[in-house]
């Protein structure tokens, strides 16, 4: 691999193997991350699970249908501004606003992810690319302490690979991103279980009394910036895989993970 590509992969490894959203939230709120969950009611988990699935469905139906496929630089600042605005509203109303605010934020984020994918040479007309964009939402955090072995980038890709392939075939056969197909429902459920962890962290931070509308905007800005970084890293890996082959990139990725101290058990 050329040196510039090795450096790009090194940056991607750091982003994908050491997501920093929780730490960023703690900095915004000025409180330890461990205190966040105390700000949420016990009933929040069901509401968050329902909202994340709804948001991913909405994003899959809407966001990439309006994206152009001509390669150009990703316009991340516009999407951040839009997400921050929706977060200001959500920060004022908390959990009650989640069913409205989260789908809006997720659609904005998926459009931004598609923008990044296109800039890295992906074809947004390809259903597999659409689903690879959606897959980014599963790459942003752990499901729990017991999930460490399954949280590495390639581990998550491997866990989702069958569902992504089946969903891509479903979309090709139907000609549209149809709602309600069993394979799509299964894939969205898998992604939502991981996306929901980050959503919970976001909502818990917004529920801290000192946050308010301004803090809600800051949290949503960090939220979309987090997934933009994940997307940039994810599609950097995919670009390098197209150039050098998957095996070469995987070997280089694992070597860098070891050197940087991020190595996990290989699944």
Language model segments and positions:
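Terminal, membrane-proximal amphipathic helices
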Residues: 1-86, 111-267
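Glycine-rich active-site/cofactor-binding loop and its immediate structural neighborhood
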Residues: 82, 86-100, 107, 111
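Short hydrophobic alpha-helical segments that form membrane-spanning helices or hydrophobic packing faces
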Residues: 101-105, 216-219
């Amino acid at each position: 691999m050329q040196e510039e590509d090795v450096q790009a992969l090194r940056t991607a490894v750091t982003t994908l193997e050491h997501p920093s959203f929780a730490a960023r939230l703690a900095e915004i709120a000025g409180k330890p991350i461990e205190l966040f969950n105390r700000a949420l009611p016990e009933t929040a988990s069901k509401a968050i699970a329902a909202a994340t699935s709804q948001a991913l469905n909405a994003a899959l139906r809407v966001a990439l249908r309006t994206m152009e496929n001509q390669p150009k630089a990703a316009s991340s600042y516009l999407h951040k501004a839009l997400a921050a605005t929706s977060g200001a509203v959500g920060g004022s109303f908390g959990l009650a606003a989640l069913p409205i605010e989260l789908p809006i934020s997720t659609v904005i984020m998926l459009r931004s992810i598609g923008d990044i994918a296109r800039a890295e040479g992906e074809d947004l007309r390809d259903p597999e690319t659409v689903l690879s964009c959606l897959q980014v939402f599963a790459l942003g955090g752990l499901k729990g302490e017991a999930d460490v072995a399954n949280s590495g980038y390639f581990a998550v890709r491997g866990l989702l690979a069958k569902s992504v392939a089946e969903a891509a075939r479903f979309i090709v056969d139907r000609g549209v991103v149809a709602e309600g197909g069993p394979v799509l429902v299964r894939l969205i459920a898998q992604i939502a279980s991981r996306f929901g962890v980050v959503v919970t962290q976001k909502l818990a931070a917004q529920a801290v009394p000192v946050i308010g509308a301004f803090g809600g905007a800051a949290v949503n800005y960090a939220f979309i910036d987090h997934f933009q970084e994940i997307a940039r890293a994810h599609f950097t890996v995919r670009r390098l895989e197209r150039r050098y082959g998957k095996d070469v990139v995987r070997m280089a990725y694992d070597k860098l993970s070891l050197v940087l101290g991020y190595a996990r058990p290989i699944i």
